[in-house]
Design a protein with these regions (language model features):
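Outer-membrane beta-barrel "beta-signal"
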Residues: 486-502
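Outer-membrane beta-barrel proteins
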Residues: 68-72, 148-150, 188-192, 234-239, ...
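Surface-exposed loop/turn segments flanking beta-strands in extracellular/periplasmic regions
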Residues: 78-94, 353-358, 409, 466-474, ...
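Transmembrane beta-barrel architecture of outer-membrane proteins
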Residues: 54, 115-120, 162-165, 208-212, ...
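Outer membrane beta-barrel
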Residues: 48-79, 83, 87-99, 104-235, ...
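N-terminal periplasmic/intermembrane-space "pro-region" immediately following the signal or transit peptide
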Residues: 6-7, 11-76
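Extracellular loop and loop/strand-boundary signature of outer-membrane beta-barrel proteins
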Residues: 106-109, 151-154, 195-201, 239-250, ...
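Detector for outer-membrane/organellar transmembrane beta-barrel domains
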Residues: 267-426, 430
Length: 502
């Protein structure tokens, strides 16, 4: 521990410091011959120099000032905004009749914020070999914390350290094995949004750090293949919802199956492109009650016993991205389609309900399309204008649910952006973010305007038809009828950011 502290302190003082890792001296012994029958002493003729372990301290000091014209779902006192909040004064529905709501919209309230919690500190290690591979490692943290506090309470973990990266990489000539915590498979280090806002393209761009085992291999001159298994160890970066087993972390652990992903990538000096997929298994519930006479689940009282159950939900999503780099521009495009994005600070989730006949729990995942693009002018090294555009669409459940198959009072939605309590769901979201980055040495200033428009509506399947009856199916798509109470929540955000890299 003392030695580690010495390394870290030396790195902070000198920024980059090299330490000698002591190893036993190896000798090549050669007999000098014999003189008068006496053997000459063995003389060492060569030594192997000690390996050098390099430790580099890096990071940046960052300060953000931001203004929002509307309240949002946000993180850490608004430093990271996700999407504009729905209206609180929607028209009042009575049967099939809508009447005006006289109240003000409580979410139509501006805010001005300041923060330095994105400041980052990291340590890179390397310079040694093992198992025939070059070994390197990274330990990275910031002051973003891991949870939000109640507004005005100071009860969150803002300003506290959180673990971002902690991994070891083993590099051979044509392959790499990485073990530890790093970016999720859909966050592409060589192709991610460079927004001034710390949201880094959330909720269009998947964002999270996950413990993983990742193996990459060159399969051609410009082609590589990556495969990995991973899991969750932080509720904020796990499937969102109110799980019977705890958090989304627990839901994956009880499934006893790791998430997995694979990508095929082409890359040369100017062009990068890849396609991939990811699978994830959850076990939202592990116990239930069962009637010993009827075999029906979910009962209470005499004749019902507790049973362990296996009710897994499997989700699948797909990825495609590309990046073009020239002397004048950098263009990026990234798209995902699938069913599992709340663990990436995204929207959507899954519906759960009890079968009306057997009482067993059933699950249906919601489908979603996410895409974003970014264009950066690189004509100048000092001033670089850019624009980010993101779009997402709620595609509804993979299979609609017949309302007759749902046991009364058991239908729920686990996720983000959809609520059975309010009967509301997101429809689509568009974000347009122009910015200008100013560079000078290790300093950067950025000014950005972010326009986010989220369309909300009542959930299709919960809206009465003209005769007052409810539809026979529910798919959690947004309603399209006039009485679906559509509302587009719009937020204008202006950000000013200062960064000093070291």
């Amino acid at each position: 521990m003392k030695k580690l502290l010495f390394y870290l302190m030396g790195g902070v003082l000198a920024q980059t410091q090299t330490f000698a890792q002591q190893v036993p001296l190896a000798t090549n012994n050669t007999a000098a011959g014999t003189i008068a029958g006496v053997t000459a002493p063995v003389v060492p003729t060569a030594t192997v120099p000690p390996a050098e372990q390099k430790i580099t301290v890096y990071g940046f000091l960052r300060n953000d000032i931001y203004y929002n014209s509307r309240r949002n779902l946000d993180l850490r006192d608004g430093v990271l905004d996700v999407y504009p909040s729905d209206a609180t004064n929607l028209p009042i529905r009575t049967g099939t009749v809508l009447t005006a709501n006289p109240n003000d919209d409580a979410n139509a309230t501006p805010q001005l914020g300041y923060s330095a919690i994105v400041t980052r500190l990291g340590v890179r290690m390397g310079g040694i070999t093992a198992f025939g591979a070059k070994i390197s490692g990274t330990l990275e943290t910031d002051f973003f914390g891991i949870s939000n506090g109640t507004a005005g309470s100071g009860s969150g973990t803002e300003n506290l350290l959180r673990l971002r990266h902690a991994f070891v990489a083993m590099d051979w000539t044509k392959s790499q094995l990485m073990i530890g915590q790093y970016w999720n498979p859909n966050f592409i280090v060589k192709c991610f949004p460079g927004t001034a806002n710390f949201n880094t393209g959330i909720p269009f761009n998947p964002f999270s750090f996950v413990p993983q085992v990742r193996y990459s291999s060159k399969v051609g001159k410009d082609v590589s293949l990556m495969g990995m298994i991973f899991g969750y160890d932080l509720a904020a970066f796990s499937p969102a919802g109110t799980f019977a087993v705890g958090s989304g972390v627990d839901a994956q652990k009880f499934a006893t199956l790791p998430a997995f992903a694979s990508q095929l990538t082409f890359e040369n000096k100017t062009f990068l492109a890849s396609v991939g997929f990811e699978g994830n298994t959850l076990s939202p519930r592990i116990t239930d009650t069962k009637n010993t006479s009827t075999g029906v689940f979910g009962g209470t009282g005499t004749g019902n016993i507790q049973k362990n159950i296996s009710s897994n939900l499997f989700t699948l999503n797909f990825l495609a991205y590309a990046k073009l780099t020239t002397s004048k521009i950098t263009a990026k495009f990234h798209s995902t389609y699938g069913q599992s994005y709340t663990q990436y600070v995204g929207l959507g989730g899954f519906a759960e309900y009890r079968d009306n006949t057997t009482g067993e729990w059933k699950y249906e995942a919601q489908n979603q399309l996410n895409m974003w693009g970014e264009l950066i002018s690189t004509n100048s090294k000092k001033i670089q204008p850019a624009i980010f555009i993101g779009y997402l669409q709620n595609m509804g459940l993979g299979n609609s649910i017949a309302t007759s198959s749902i046991k009364t009072g058991t239908l729920a939605f686990q996720g983000r952006g959809v609520s059975m309590a309010t009967g509301r769901t997101f429809d689509n979201m568009l974000r347009i973010s122009p910015r200008v980055d100013f560079y000078s040495g290790k300093m950067k200033f950025a000014l950005e305007y972010e326009l986010s428009m989220m369309k909300w509506a009542d959930i299709q399947g919960l809206i009465p038809t003209a005769d007052g009856a409810l539809p026979t199916n529910i798919d959690f798509k947004p309603g399209t009828a006039d009485n679906a109470r559509p509302f587009t929540a719009t937020n204008s955000r202006v950000s000013a950011v200062m960064v000093y890299n070291f």
